[in-house]
Amino acid sequence: MLTLYGQERSPENSTTSTTDASDRRDETPSSEIVVRDIHAMTTTTELTRPQQRGSGGGYLSPSRSIAFSDGTTSSGENFTTVSREFNALVIAGSSMDNNSNGTNQSGGHRDVIRDERNELTRIGENDDVGDHGQVPEEDSNPWAIVPDDYNNRDGSENNIVLASSGGQNRMVTTASVQRVKREEVEAKITAWQTAKVAKINNRFKRQDAVINGWLNEQVHRANSWMKKIERKLEDRRAKAMEKTQNKVAKAQRKAEERRATAEGKRGTEVARVLEVANLMRAVGRPPAKRSFFSLS
């Protein structure tokens, strides 16, 4: 049997108003010492939670526990403790919901785990979010009430952690495989695109060379035809020039001949006139007028 000394609320303070009681719920009321006997194997003892791991390594008894008693003071304190724990659980749950989208990022995931661990440590509910990387130590509190499946629960938590780690590793591996496949597909597409573009460029270069050859051939043919026409024109010009010169020479010769003929005829007529004039002088007879019918 263990004898404990507790505190009960005095009847004098129970008659205060509801507002004053709610404002001073967390304060220590005036009390008197009451002696209670607690037996080890009864149901009226404190219901303690399994020990959680402290900051110094090793399991420590929880800082808060729910005590069941018949007194008014114990019921008020338990109601306050349950309300605080419920509020802390609600805050922790809202933090978990608000940060559920950022669990894939390492920094955000660590911050969420740290916040949840702090909240659950503050209310004494950090059994499920403890440090799974270290080996828990044995319980040193003989009065702690441990559930029957406590060891199995630790093993299940470790299995859950390992399963989550394995799932994350599988997700990372799947993401890596998908990234490698995507890079391989991108490399194939790039190689195909490069080959097609090179083929099109080579085809265009061949067509350009053919077009340039055809253009050069057409230009050469046009120049050859022009030169041929020029040569023909030169020949025709030479022939025309020669023909023109021949015609000019022939005209000149004919002109000379006609001039000589006219000159001879003139000389003959002048000599005949002079002879008739001399005869008329000698006879002394003037020239007679010619009639219309006279012959010259």
Swiss-Prot record:
PTM comment text: Phosphorylated by KIN11. Probably ubiquitinated and degraded by the 26S proteasome pathway.
UniProt-annotated stretches for the region Disordered: 1-78, 121-142, 242-266
Family: Belongs to the remorin family.
Coiled-coil intervals, chain numbering: 226-261
InterPro entries with a match to the protein in the record: Remorin_C
Phenotypic consequence of gene deletion: Slightly reduced susceptibility to Beet Curly Top Virus (BCTV) and Beet Severe Curly Top Virus (BSCTV). The double mutant rem4.1 rem4.2 displays resistance to BCTV and BSCTV.
Biased composition range(s): Basic and acidic residues: 21-39, 121-135, 253-266
Amino acid composition bias (Polar residues), ranges on this chain: 41-53, 62-78
Annotated localization: Cell membrane
Primary location class: membrane
Molecular function as annotated in GO: kinase binding
Organism of this sequence: Arabidopsis thaliana (Mouse-ear cress)
UniProt tissue specificity: Predominantly detected in bud, stem, root, flower, silique, and leaves, and enhanced dramatically in senescence leaf.
One record GO biological process: response to abscisic acid
Ubl conjugation found in the keyword field: yes
Top-level taxonomy: Eukaryota, Viridiplantae, Streptophyta, Embryophyta, Tracheophyta
Protein name, per record: Remorin 4.1
Induction trigger: Induced by mannitol, NaCl, drought, as well exogenous abscisic acid (ABA) application.
Subunit annotation: Forms homodimer and heterodimer with REM4.2. Interacts with KIN11.
Role, per record: Collaborates with REM4.2 to positively regulate the BCTV and BSCTV susceptibility.
Key words, A-Z: Cell membrane, Coiled coil, Membrane, Phosphoprotein, Ubl conjugation
GO (cellular component) term, any one: plasma membrane
